Swiss-Prot record:
This is Hemoglobin subunit beta-1. Red blood cells. The gene is hbb1. It comes from Anarhichas minor. The keyword Methyltransferase does not apply. Involved in oxygen transport from gills to the various peripheral tissues.
Length: 146
């Protein structure tokens, strides 16, 4: 993947400005509420029976934060994202058996949450760079499924 200097700067700036403890739980909660079939991977996380239960679930919040910290790996390894996610790809494909389509769903939910937080600063150019980055990460996470 080729990254322009502008794309790199935008991605680094977005992640530097995110409150992971706010954005991570909101993005994962949104995914589990909007796409309820994704809840099947979180059976050990307790009550997921209602949107309020999901949004108030501390295990969901903690995992959402963990996901955002996992994206730091991509930000720090933009020239080698596929290799940076090999371990996580193996974990999600071989151990957790996560449907790789769910990575895209979560990326879409993250985009919505980040856009809502950034407001007018989430310009089309910003969205372009952000979604390009997430698409590369999603592809890297799914590479072990092939």
């Amino acid at each position: 993947v080729k990254w322009s200097d502008k794309e790199r700067a935008v991605i680094i700036s977005i992640f530097a400005g995110l409150d992971y403890e706010d954005i991570g739980p909101k993005a994962l909660s949104r995914c589990l509420i909007v796409y309820p079939w994704t809840q099947r991977y979180f059976g050990s996380f307790g009550n997921l029976s209602t949107p309020a239960a999901i949004m108030g679930n501390p295990k969901i919040a903690a995992h959402g934060i963990k996901v955002l910290h996992g994206l730091d790996r991509g930000v720090k390894n933009m020239d080698n994202i596929k290799d940076a996610y090999t371990e996580l790809s193996i974990l999600h494909s071989e151990t957790l058996h996560v449907d790789p389509d769910n990575f895209k769903l979560l990326a879409d939910c993250l985009t919505i949450v980040v856009a809502a937080k950034m407001g007018c600063a989430f310009t089309p150019d910003t969205q372009l760079a952000f979604q390009k980055f997430l698409a590369v990460v999603v592809s890297a996470l799914g590479k072990q499924y092939c």
